[in-house]
């Protein structure tokens, strides 16, 4: 019986060890020196277990073998979980565009069949091709080919006609535009109700990068959205991009530059079906992540290699899983109700934050004279705190909770093999990354002689926007170039050496 038990134990250990090695090689995250160490460790265990069974030390050998089997199983479970998370992060790159058919909230209609005799309209300025496709579906479902879709180019005219409810009784619009219109027309999203929704999915058409991330500089676009449900589907949906960070990374010098562009920046964006016009940067996200990427590439004259979409609401669980983070605040402030139901107070300098505090820190803007500019800097500071904690040895003791949290808040087109290369780079080197930050500056005042901004893509007039300074954009371009060229420097020290004349500082792009 003892011999049979020993043989069964040996078979079990060989099977688990084989699965462990398979997972390790499949993940490809361990540098060569660690692979050699793992194989040597397993070989020694089996040699000791084999030889000790013929000696008086076989009991000690069995005890050690059981302990080592536990270690092997633990490592196998870790590697399996990491493999599962990486596969989840690399879901097919699909954008989901939702089109709504809306009527007034107090309308008696409760289904599409009730709209057979309604007058439909849409805003041709802000809509993509899916809106007309959705209306074709409406006509088909109602079996009324004679239905017409009235065209409006101005939201002022369309909303006025809709509220009057004579010439327009139903609007066909992209779901992502509801919040945009509500920002200009108070409570628009609560004054309407959705009768029908249509979903249209398409593959993201971002060009694949061939950069060698172990040796060559590369650029990642970080897009932050707010989704209360935290579902994977929300990350793939077209939505406003509240956080827009360009991360320039040089693996040779271990430097990262995070450049924040304010969400309300009035710049030329890529809109529906590739159309371009001056609008808010955040609105580009309504037309897919590739529209935001194209917008920032044109603004800075760069090629973005990869993107990461983050559910900022989900950052709560990630920060908590990390055991909290340290955020270095530029200013002292207390956040208001819009940012958090709890009035968290932050001091100038380091602040130890849990998940709720970190999100509140990132959301607040009304407490600052600089408004959206300071919020952008705060968001960058929070991401810097997450990166510093995530690349520290402390994460090893919290791997399970971190992996669980990360899997539901990130969506990326970074290939698993590239992520493996980055992990191997960090494991083989071990040195800390030097994370630098820079935020685009600007003004909310329009240029002399110009009236309120007109948003050419979304068709809104008089919106509150940010006019970026041309010199601030140029400085960001210089900093990105320095990182890519391998220069090792401190951003604050470099900026203090730049002399900017008053006219140049106030020129707008």
Locate predicted features.
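Membrane-embedded alpha-helical segments of integral membrane proteins
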Residues: 9-50
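Membrane-helix interface "capping/anchor" motifs
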Residues: 51-59
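Alpha-helical transmembrane segments of integral membrane proteins
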Residues: 7, 33-37, 59-66
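Aromatic-capped interface at the extracytoplasmic side
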Residues: 79-92
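Non-catalytic, solvent-exposed segments at the cell envelope interface
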Residues: 89-90, 94-95, 103-105, 111-113, ...
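Single conserved hydrophobic/aromatic residue that forms the stacking wall/gate
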Residues: 1-8, 12, 498-509
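Internal/C-terminal transmembrane anchor helices
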Residues: 58-80
């Amino acid at each position: 019986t003892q011999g049979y038990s020993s043989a069964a134990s040996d078979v079990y250990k060989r099977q688990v060890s084989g699965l462990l090695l398979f997972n390790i090689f499949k993940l490809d995250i361990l540098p060569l020196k660690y692979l050699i160490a793992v194989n040597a460790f397993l070989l020694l265990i089996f040699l000791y277990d084999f030889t000790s069974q013929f000696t008086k030390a076989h009991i000690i050998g069995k005890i050690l073998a059981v302990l080592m089997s536990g270690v092997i199983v633990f490592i196998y479970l870790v590697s399996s979980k990491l493999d599962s998370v990486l596969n989840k992060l690399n879901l097919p790159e699909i954008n989901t565009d939702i089109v709504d058919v809306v009527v007034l909230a107090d309308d008696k209609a409760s289904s599409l069949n009730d709209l057979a005799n309604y007058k439909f309209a849409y805003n041709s300025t802000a809509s993509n091709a899916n809106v007309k496709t959705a209306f074709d579906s409406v006509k088909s479902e109602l079996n009324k080919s004679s239905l017409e879709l009235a065209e409006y180019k101005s939201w002022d005219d369309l909303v006025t006609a809709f509220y009057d409810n004579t010439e327009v009784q139903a609007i066909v619009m992209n779901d992502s535009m509801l919040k945009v219109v509500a920002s200009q027309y108070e409570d628009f999203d609560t004054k309407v109700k959705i009768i029908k929704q249509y979903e249209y999915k398409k593959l993201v058409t971002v060009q694949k990068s061939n950069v060698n991330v172990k040796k060559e500089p590369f650029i990642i676009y970080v897009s932050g959205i707010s989704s209360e449900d935290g579902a994977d589907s929300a990350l793939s949906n077209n939505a406003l991009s509240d956080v827009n960070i360009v991360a320039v990374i040089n693996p040779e010098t271990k430097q990262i530059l995070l450049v924040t562009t304010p969400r309300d920046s009035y710049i030329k964006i890529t809109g529906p079906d590739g159309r371009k016009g001056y609008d808010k940067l955040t609105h580009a996200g309504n037309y897919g992540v590739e529209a935001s990427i194209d917008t920032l590439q044109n603004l800075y004259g760069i090629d973005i290699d990869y993107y990461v979409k983050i559910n900022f609401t989900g950052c709560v669980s990630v920060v908590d899983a990390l055991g909290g983070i340290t955020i270095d605040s530029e200013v002292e402030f207390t956040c208001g109700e819009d940012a958090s139901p709890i009035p968290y107070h932050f001091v100038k300098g380091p602040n130890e934050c849990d998940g709720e505090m970190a999100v509140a820190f990132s959301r607040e803007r009304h407490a600052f004279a600089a408004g959206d500019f300071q919020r952008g800097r705060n968001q960058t500071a929070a991401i810097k705190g997450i990166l510093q904690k995530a690349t520290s040895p402390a994460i090893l003791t919290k791997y399970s909770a971190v992996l669980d949290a990360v899997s539901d808040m990130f969506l990326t087109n970074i290939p698993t093999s590239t992520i493996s290369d980055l992990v191997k780079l960090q494991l083989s080197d071990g040195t800390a990354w030097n994370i630098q930050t820079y935020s685009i500056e600007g003004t909310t005042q329009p240029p002399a002689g110009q009236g309120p901004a007109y948003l050419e893509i979304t068709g809104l007039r008089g919106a509150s926007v940010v006019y970026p300074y041309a010199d601030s954009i140029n400085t960001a371009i210089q900093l990105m170039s320095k990182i890519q060229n391998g220069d090792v420097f401190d951003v604050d020290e470099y900026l203090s050496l730049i002399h900017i004349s008053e006219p140049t500082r106030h020129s707008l792009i």
